[in-house]
Amino acid sequence: YLGGHSDISAGAVISSKVRIDRVYELAKSLGGTLSEFSAWLLERSIKTLPIRVWQQNENAMGLANFLNSHSLISKVYYPGLISHEGHEIAKRQMKGFGGMLSIELHPSIKPELFLKNLKIIKPVMSLAGIESTANYPKLTSHYSLTDKERSLQAISDQLIRLSAGIESIIDLKNDIDNSLKWSENEN
């Protein structure tokens, strides 16, 4: 999120002095600073962080509401939805509900086809840039787990993770809707 362009990996450690000291010792051994170029990219990009995050929040909320009533979506996981079990906590703790959401595709939709049929939203490994992206945990982040291990972590074969970017919400809704319809027809 900090860079917004999927071109750097950076962050900060916010913790107690004891933990910071441990991280500092490890960083001395492994290297804990960005290259000059990465630091420049981060400094450049952080200026637009508030507007990017605001738009990502807006788009994620719009997608969650749209998908929550879509006949080809079995479930939407997004704390901005009143139906989400963590909604009240998120409402108290956060100014927005974030740019990430997860969806369970209807059993009639093959996840691979759904991803293939997307035109604007890109299937990728990393999330949280300015472009909207989708990720299929079964074949990416949770690939090495058995079906049982994935099930224990609530990672179903139909789960897709979406990272809302800053594109037009109308375009994003149309992209998902078209992909779902095309994917259903290809079965």
Please provide the spans of the model-predicted regions.
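PLP-dependent enzyme catalytic core of the Aspartate aminotransferase-like
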Residues: I109, K116, S132-N187
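Active-site C-terminal subdomain of aminotransferase-like
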Residues: Y1-M100, E104-T133, P137
